[in-house]
Each structure stands twice: as C-alpha cells, then as structure tokens.
Amino acid sequence: MTEFFADIAPVRYEGPDSANPLAFRHYDPDEMVMGKRMEDHLRFAVAYWHSFAWEGGDPFGGQTLIRPWHPQDDMTRAKVKADAAFEMFDILGVPYFCWHDADIRPEAATFAESLRNFEEIIDHFLAKMESRRTRLLWGTANMFSHRRWMAGASTNPDPDVFAYAAATVKTCLDATQRMGGQNYVLWGGREGYETLLNTDMGRELDHMGRFLSMVVDYKHKIGFKGAILVEPKPQEPSKHQYDFDAATCIGFLRKYGLEGEVKLNLEQGHAILAGHSFEHEIAVAASEGMLGSIDMNRNDYQSGWDTDQFPNNVPEVALCYYHILRAGGFTTGGTNFDAKLRRQSLDATDLIAAHVGGMDICARGLKAAAAMIEDGGLETALRDRYAGWDSDHGQGILESDLDSLFARVLAGEIDPQPHSGRQEMLENHVNRFV
C-alpha cells in the first residue's frame, strides 16, 4: 500500500443529512432506480489522466501538485502511481476507470521501448484487478501531446506519422482487449488545423476516414467485442477540430460508411465549447442510435475555457440523464469523470472529495431524471405537441407533394393557427424534480 491515501477510509453512503465531507449523501450503489441498481445505471469511471497524470500546470504556470510518483519518467514510479490509483478506486468503490497510454507508462526513446513499458504496466494492472472489482471502461491513445502529433495523427501531412498513429492505436486496442475494456475511444485533439493556408481539408478528412476504417477492421480481426467511440470537440488544442460536435461526427461517420460501427463519447465541456448544452449533444446522438458513453464535467461559463471541473449543477445533470434514460440507458458506456482538481487543491482528500461530490451530483441527477420519466408529464406534453402528425391528416401531408399542398392551401382548406409551446410551464415542471 502507498502512503498517499493511507489515512482515508472507504467512502460509504450515509444519507442526505450526513455532514461527513467524505461520505455519499445521494449515491447509494444498491438503491433501485427504475428497476435497476444505481451503480448499474451510472457506471462511474475515474479518469487516470486527470487524477494521476496531471501535475497542476496551466498555460501560465507549471506543476503545483506533488505526488509520490513524480517525476513520471520511470517504470518504478509508474507502478507506484498504479498502486495509488487502485487504492483510490477501492476507496470510492467505482466499477471502472479509463486511461490513455501516455498516462500510465513513461515515454521511452523508441516505439519498441515505450511498448515494453506499456505492456509491463498493463500486466501490473491485470495483477491488481485479480483481487479487485474495478474494471476498464475504455482505453485510448494520446495522440496530441508529443511533438510528433503537432500537425495531427491520422490527418498529418506526413504519411509516416499516420503509420506511427496506426501502430499506436493497435497497441492500445490490444491492451484494451486484454483488460476486458468495454469500449475504445478516439479523440482527435490535433485532427484539425491551425490555418487553412497549409491545409488540404478534403484529403485530411479522407485520411481520417480511412484511419477509422482501419481501426474498425482491426477490432473485428482480433474479436474485440466492445464499442468503438469517437469524441467530439470543436477546438482546443487545435483552432478547428474536424470532430466539431455530435452532428458533425455523425455526418462524418455516414460519409465513410461507419455509422453502423462507431458511436459517440460525449463530454459536457466539449458541448459547451461547441455552443451547445450537454443534453443537446446527447439528444442528437440518441436520435441517431449513436449514443455510446459520456465524460462528465463542467466548464467555467464566464471564461469560456475548457476547465474540466467536477460537475455541481443538478438541473443540468438531470436533463442529461433524462435523455440517456429515454434512449434506454448505457450498454457498454458509462459516466467517466473527465475532471481534474483545481491547481490549488493539493491534497489526497481533495481528490476523494471531488469524486464524492461528482458522484453525488450524478446520483441526484439520475434520480430526478427517473422521477420525470415515471411522472410522464414531459412525454405527455411532447406527445400532445406532435399529435397532429399522428393523425390521418398529418400523415396525408407527409405523403403528399408540393402541387397538392399548394392547391389545398390556396383553396383555404389549410389555414394553420399557432399553438403555445408552453416552455415556461415545462420549465416549471422540471423544477419540481430538481
């Protein structure tokens, strides 16, 4: 056991009246919600990169977090970091975690040496998992931090970088399968451009489509049963990223014939950067049958930055889970806390408290969403609003043509009168539950 979490006891559910800052007030994993355990609805995961690899730096300052596994440049400390991570998983009782390859192993001088480090730490993970319940929700490759990726991975103008990216994803998908991961995620932080002056957009998109097809082909070759997910984000670190939002990704997947093979991993902060609400992105993906998993966090609404803070807004979270539940809930996906401490939150207890708070907020949101579904008021309002389309009259309009509809309108047979959308009443209805 490491010393980092030595004085912190496992977090327990103590109910809403508890004053214990390291206790769950709302998250009871065994509580039944719509006939299913709360844990099985939410499927919480810890993000290895923010919780264990991030050192507290920002664009104006360096490291603020001092950990026993720093500096992160050798395998001995990588294993110390892994040991601490699994201790935190035990303390929180989370069923899943997620990683990038660069989070868990030090970068070496060659690809082969980095791969040896990677495989060694995967072996270490598997040994830890033998006596624990925490499993891998998804793995992914970091193809945005190292300078080789500065002009992209699959969209790079250098074909050798494309090949290096392919080799990297192969190793990460292999490791994800070894660990029993339920998904594999691709996020293209550098798959975009800084300026169109040196960018052949059509070629880059074709290369990105070909790359994703190669990933899908390899998934089937090795028999990986999990889902392949892509994660939208409009910008940061690139000026413009090709996977701008859910709708853009869906159009991309359809263009390259991948809509039956790939789903979406959606993040709250990325939705905000794209000018959307999180429930908008979830609803878009769900409407196309492409909702895979979510990264739960929040942004700073004043600065506009992608600050990756832990969630604390119950009404927002409730509406997210409302759309997830309406879509049937998660299958292979879950709720990954893609969130990090503030750079002044230095202690191990801060890391635990942040996750406890986030898990409680999600539990409250889930219960509110379930209550709204069971109440049925929103569904009734929706059904009434579109009832005209379910009538013979509405179906006849859909099956008609422009000339026929023109004639009916001209004859005065059709003279529409507006109806109230009742937005304020519906907002008040939601407020009864949150």
Swiss-Prot record:
Q: Which residues bind Mg(2+) 2?
A: 267, 270, 306, 308
Looking at the UniProt record for this protein, which Gene Ontology cellular component terms does it annotate, in alphabetical order? cytoplasm
**Cofactor binding annotation:** Binds 2 magnesium ions per subunit.
Chain positions recorded as Mg(2+) 1 binding sites: 231, 267, 295, 338
Q: Does the keyword Magnesium apply?
A: yes
Cofactor dependence is on: Mg(2+)
Query: Which keywords describe this protein according to UniProt?
Result: Carbohydrate metabolism, Cytoplasm, Isomerase, Magnesium, Metal-binding, Xylose metabolism
Kindly list the places in or outside the cell where this protein is found, as annotated in its UniProt entry: Cytoplasm
Q: Record's InterPro entries?
A: Xyl_isomerase-like_sf (IPR036237), Xylose_isom_bac (IPR013452), Xylose_isomerase (IPR001998)
Name the EC number(s).
5.3.1.5
Name the Gene Ontology molecular function terms of this record. Answer: magnesium ion binding; xylose isomerase activity
Q: Where is the active site?
A: 100, 103
The processes (GO biological process) annotated in the record are:
D-xylose metabolic process
Cite the PROSITE patterns for this sequence. XYLOSE_ISOMERASE
Question: What is this enzyme's catalytic activity, as reactions?
Answer: alpha-D-xylose = alpha-D-xylulofuranose
- Is the keyword Ribonucleoprotein in the record? no
Q: Which NCBIfam families match?
A: PRK05474.1 (NF003998), xylose_isom_A (TIGR02630)
Tell me, how does this one assemble? Homotetramer.
In which family does this protein belong, per the annotation?
Belongs to the xylose isomerase family.
Q: Which HAMAP family match?
A: Xylose_isom_A
The name this protein goes by in its record: Xylose isomerase
What is the organism of origin for this protein?
Ruegeria pomeroyi (strain ATCC 700808 / DSM 15171 / DSS-3)
